[in-house]
Amino acid sequence: MFYAHFVLSKRGPLAKIWLAAHWDKKLTKAHVFECNLESSVESIICPKVKMALRTSGHLLLGVVRIYHRKAKYLLADCNEAFIKIKMAFRPGVVDLPEENREAAYNAITLPEEFHDFDQPLPDLDDIDVAQQFSLNQSRVEEITMREEVSNINILQDNDFGDFGMDDREMMREGSAFEDDMLTTNASNLKLEPEQSTSQLNEKSNHLEYDDQYKDDNFGEGNEGGILDDKLLSNDAGGIFDDPPAMPEEGVAMPEQPVHDDLDDDDNVSMGAPDSPDSVDPVEPLPTMTDQTTLVPNEEEAFALEPIDITVKETKAKRKRKLIVDSVKELDSKTIRAQLSDYSDIVTTLDLAPPTKKLMMWKETGGVEKLFSLPAQPLWNTRLLKLFTRCLTPLVLDDLRKRRKGGEADNLDEFLKEFENPEVPREELRPQDVIDQPILEEASHLQESLMEGSRTHLDDTIMPPPPPKQGVKRDSLQMEPEPMPMMQEAEPQIEMPPPPLPPPLELPPEEPQSISDLIPELNLLPEKEKEKDEEEEEEEEDTTGTEQDQEERRWNKRTQQMLHGLQRVLAKTGAESISLLDLCRNTNRKQAAAKFYSFLVLKKQQAIELTQREPYSDIVATPGPRFHTV
């Protein structure tokens, strides 16, 4: 151990020092300011527990870092203070002139004014208090509200003291109003306001106190009134008579509109002129007037429309049903199928060709373009129409006519080759062209070989064609019909034909590749790949993980490579095999698989690999376990 445990404790004396030495970013500014370097250095020099030299060195590094942080913070504070002082006292900041930079003494000093508090107060007679008070006084008439009381000629007493305020006294003092109310008949329901008021005034003037008790109908049931049988008598009634509801006779409505416009509280006023004999209103009278409201006013004032009593129907809340899935768990097959299906996240790689020429060939290399466009672009639409008008497959018809004539043996093969001119080019895929642009020359050689074979076949079967026929086939590949416009495009499109005949003899001189000799070296051909993938899917469903399947696949490839190498060495008798020769005419994926197989065999000591210099050829020789693995 290079350190003691007390150093690493959070509350130890050297905790911050150790933290600064190993984790400087963890220290905050507060920790740096709180750290006392003097005590820390003393505890390092004279530790309580013996420390190793390495530990003391780490602690000294922490001391230096904390001191550096303190000096850095001090420098930053000094710079900030210096900048603020410099900004505050820089010349030219004050816009005032020099003479006005100092404030005047009177502007910043309060004047010393001592008032004389010993002066005598003025006499009260000097101030006209009454005049000032009279200005604020108002007359009694201005500040007192008038009591506007309507004169109701119902009660005869003007005397406030003689009139009893009790309900019992009011009922005892029968008036003409009570007399008329109780003695009214149905025949007197016709309203005559002027006549009734005059009669009421006369009665109220001539009634005496004894007559009131005589005619109050209290305890005498034979006087006759509303509740008596003499309802249809012709006795005179007042305006305030309460008529009974009689269906036999109609009620005459008043013709004066004065009573219609009055409220319930004003129905007691008949509009008669004020007289000295009129009686002042009393508190309990409104209840009596409510009881003597006229029927016409009742119909007009209180005939309201019937209220439609309908209760708003509230929608009943629907109970939410809990929907539970019948299948709560996915089985392993479904999950495995979802994981294996990655078609929605994988698309085909569509890369543009590396050169503009290849891009132009890719755009114009289709059948629809070759049958409608010349070898060079025609920007004029009229010329393009003239060109496409002459595009008719006459050669095929001519060949079919000759086939009927007896030249069918060789024509069958020629027609197959002519109708499928792209078969030799299938070896060079667009991906291979993108991945290996160096193989463009090889494609030209293949085209030249194909053209040479075609021209040879044409010479043997057909009459000698015009010199532009080969150019036509190279550009259109489906139109051997000679065109006059193609003669002009011949020198621009077909550059390589003159030097092509010599390379025709090159393929026999090239050595045959090792992979052609031994088919086992072509790791997992196309037909076997599909079977291998199907087997892998079946095995993946049963047992094993993806890593196991990958290892099994590489084991099969390495075994295939080992058997191929054994057969090559047995056939050729060579002592070594070159990886460059082995990877000839293969794409990158196949070359990488072969190289990986070499490495696996080298790990298993089946072969020995040697390389003279970086990026040079790798040579494989048999190892100690070449025949035993």
Swiss-Prot record:
Q: Name one GO cellular component term.
A: cytosol
Where along the chain is composition biased (Pro residues)?
Answer: 494-510
Give the domain of life.
Eukaryota
Q: Name one GO molecular function term.
A: chromatin binding
Q: Which SUPFAM superfamilies match?
A: Winged helix' DNA-binding domain (SSF46785)
Bias type Acidic residues, positions:
531-549
Region Disordered: what ranges?
245-284, 447-475, 491-553
- Name the UniProt key words of this record, in alphabetical order: Activator, Apoptosis, Cell cycle, Cell division, Centromere, Chromosome, Chromosome partition, Cytoplasm, Cytoskeleton, Developmental protein, DNA damage, DNA repair, Mitosis, Nucleus, Phosphoprotein, Repressor, Transcription, Transcription regulation
Could you state one GO biological process linked to this protein? chromosome segregation
Q: Where is the composition biased (Low complexity)?
A: 273-282
Mod. after translation: Cleaved by separase/ESPL1 at the onset of anaphase; this cleavage is required for sister chromatid separation and cytokinesis. Cleaved by caspases at the beginning of apoptosis. Phosphorylated; becomes hyperphosphorylated in M phase of cell cycle. The large dissociation of cohesin from chromosome arms during prophase may be partly due to phosphorylation by PLK1/PLX1.
Per the UniProt record, the site (Cleavage) maps to 172-173, 277-278
Keyword Glycoprotein included in the entry's annotation: no
Keyword Cell membrane attributed: no
Q: What does UniProt say about this protein's domains?
A: The C-terminal part associates with the head of smc1a, while the N-terminal part binds to the head of smc3.
Q: Subunit arrangement?
A: Component of the cohesin complex, which consists of an SMC1 and SMC3 heterodimer core and 2 non-Smc subunits RAD21 and STAG1/SA1, STAG2/SA2 or STAG3/SA3.
State the family it belongs to: Belongs to the rad21 family.
Q: What name does the UniProt record give this protein?
A: Double-strand-break repair protein rad21 homolog
